[in-house]
A protein has these predicted regions:
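Catalytic machinery of carbohydrate-active enzymes
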Residues: 1-348
C-alpha cells in the first residue's frame, strides 16, 4: 500500500503527526508512507524511520493557488498512491490528493471538505481532547474508534533518533565544552511574549544552574535571539562563559542534535518542546494562557507547570503588553525543584 500524508506546517504539529505514521506502519507493515510538508520539515521527517520520502510542499502556508495545486496533484499521479491522509483542516490542504486522483482520502471535516475528501470524519472535541489522538484516529476505519478511550494503548508517541557520533560532532562544531553537562533552554514561543516565561526568570535559573556546575545553551529561531541576549546580559562575566545563545545560530537539524545532547530541557509551550519530548529528554514545560490539555509534551519524562486552568486566547495584539501574569508567577525556584527531581530520576 502506498500512502501520502499532507503534513502540518508547524514544528510541534509536525512532531505530533509522527504518531500517525507510527500507527499506520504498525497496522500496515508493508506500507510506503510519503509526507508532503514545507521543505523546512525535512530535518524532522528524515529522522522518522516510518517516513519513506519527504516531499516538499512548494506553495506558501496561506496561498490558495488552485492552478498550482492542480499541477502538483497531477505530477503525483504516477506514484499511484492508494490512500491519502490530510492533517491540516484547511480547504486548500485537501486539494493536492484530490487532483492526484488518490482513491481513498481521509481527514477531519475542517473547512467543509466534502467531495475533496471521501472519508470525512466529523470531530467531537470532547471525545478527542488531544491533538495527537485526533491524528492517530485517522489510521482506523471510520466508526471503529468513537472516542479516544477506544484507541489501542499505549499510544505510539513521537520518537526521534540521534547518534552519539552526531552529538559529539555537533557539540564540537559549536565549541560546546565537554567539561560540564548541558541544560537546554527554549525561551521562545509563537505570538510574542504572551506564551513565554519571562527572560529574567530564565536568567535567574541559568545563574543557579551554572553555579551548580552546568552549562546552559539557549535554543530557538532568529526571532528568539534577542530574548537570549537579554538572558545573557543578566549574568555576570564568569557565568556568561557557561551560557551560549544559539537561538538563530543553528539549522533545525543541528538544534535537534544539540537538544538530544542536553541533560534536560526547560521550555515554553513551543515546537522545540515537542522535539525535546520526542528525544526523550527530561523536560520542564512552562504553560500560561495556552493549555497543555490539547498539546502536552508527549513524554513520561516531562513535568508541566501551569498555575491557571482553562484556555485563554493568545492574541498577538495583547502580547505587546508583555508577559502573561500566570507565567510571571512561576518562580525560578519552583522550576529548579522540578528540574532537580527529573535529573535525580534520570540518574537512579
Amino acid at each position: 500500500m502506498k500512502i501520502l500524508v499532507i503534513g502540518p506546517s508547524w514544528v510541534g504539529d509536525m512532531m505530533m503527526s509522527q504518531s500517525l505514521y507510527r500507527t499506520l506502519q504498525a497496522r500496515y507493515p508493508q506500507a510506503i508512507i510519503d509526507v508532503m510538508a514545507p521543505a523546512w520539515c525535512r530535518p524532522l521527517l528524515s529522522r522518522m524511520p516510518e517516513v519513506n520520502e519527504a516531499i516538499p510542499m512548494p506553495l506558501g502556508h496561506g496561498a490558495l493557488e488552485i492552478g498550482e495545486r492542480r499541477k502538483l496533484g497531477h505530477s503525483l499521479r504516477e506514484k499511484r498512491y492508494d490512500r491519502a491522509y490530510v492533517l491540516p483542516n484547511s480547504f486548500k490542504s485537501a486539494l493536492v490528493p484530490f487532483f492526484a486522483g488518490i482513491p481513498h482520502r481521509t481527514g477531519w471535516r475542517g473547512e467543509m471538505r466534502y467531495g475533496l475528501l471521501n472519508d470525512v470524519r466529523v470531530l467531537d472535541k470532547e471525545a478527542w481532547p488531544l491533538m495527537v489522538e485526533r491524528y492517530i484516529a485517522l489510521a482506523y476505519d471510520k466508526g471503529i474508534m468513537r472516542t479516544a478511550q477506544d484507541l489501542p494503548q499505549p499510544l505510539l508517541w513521537p520518537q526521534l533518533q540521534v547518534s552519539e557520533g552526531e552529538k559529539s560532532y555537533t557539540c564540537n562544531q559549536f565549541s560546546l565544552s565537554s567539561e560540564r553537562p548541558m541544560i537546554g533552554f527554549c525561551p521562545g514561543a509563537e505570538f510574542g511574549p504572551a506564551k513565554r516565561w519571562p527572560h529574567y526568570h530564565y536568567a535567574e535559573l541559568a545563574k543557579q544552574l551554572i553555579d551548580e556546575g552546568y552549562q546552559v545553551v539557549l535554543f530557538g529561531s532568529a526571532k528568539d535571539h534577542e530574548a537570549g541576549n537579554e538572558i545573557l546580559a543578566a549574568l555576570n562575566t564568569e557565568q556568561q562563559a557557561w551560557c551560549r545563545n544559539l537561538a538563530g545560530e543553528t539549522q533545525l537539524d543541528q538544534a535537534v542534535i544539540l537538544i538530544a545532547a542536553c541533560k534536560a530541557i526547560v521550555t515554553n509551550d513551543s515546537g522545540l518542546m515537542h522535539v525535546a519530548a520526542a528525544l526523550n529528554r527530561p523536560l520542564v514545560a512552562l504553560f500560561g494562557p495556552s493549555s497543555p490539555d490539547f498539546t502536552p509534551p508527549l513524554s513520561h519524562k516531562a513535568r508541566v507547570i501551569r498555575l491557571i486552568t482553562g484556555y485563554h486566547k493568545v492574541r498577538k495584539g495583547d502580547a505587546a503588553e508583555g508577559y502573561h501574569q500566570s507565567l510571571i508567577d512561576i518562580t525560578p525556584q519552583r522550576v529548579l525543584e522540578e528540574l532537580n527531581a527529573l535529573l535525580l530520576q534520570e540518574e537512579a
